[in-house]
Regions:
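Compact, glycine-rich, soluble single-domain proteins
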Residues: 2-80
Length: 80
């Protein structure tokens, strides 16, 4: 599935991933290929991307995620 992570300043990440684990406002959750459509707010925490057997971690400071049709868009306030 395709993932984009965007902040007000720049596009932080764009690529094909196997899964993404997000810090939801009501607890963490994971999105995999063919996930049901979802829109959720994000809390401050770790966003973990898994692609080709490798993990990459970003720290997001809140935001919103939208997932539909194997496209995931993360709009984050900031990313470290």
């Amino acid at each position: 599935m395709n993932l984009e992570i965007i902040t007000p300043d720049k596009k932080v990440y764009a690529g094909v991933v196997d899964s993404v684990t997000l810090p939801g406002s009501n607890g963490g959750f994971q999105i995999l290929k063919d996930h049901a459509p979802i829109v959720s707010t994000l809390a401050k925490g770790n966003l973990v991307i898994e692609a080709n057997g490798k993990k990459e971690t970003f720290v997001v400071d809140g935001g919103v995620v939208e997932a539909a049709k194997n496209k995931v868009l993360v709009l984050a306030e900031s990313v470290a």
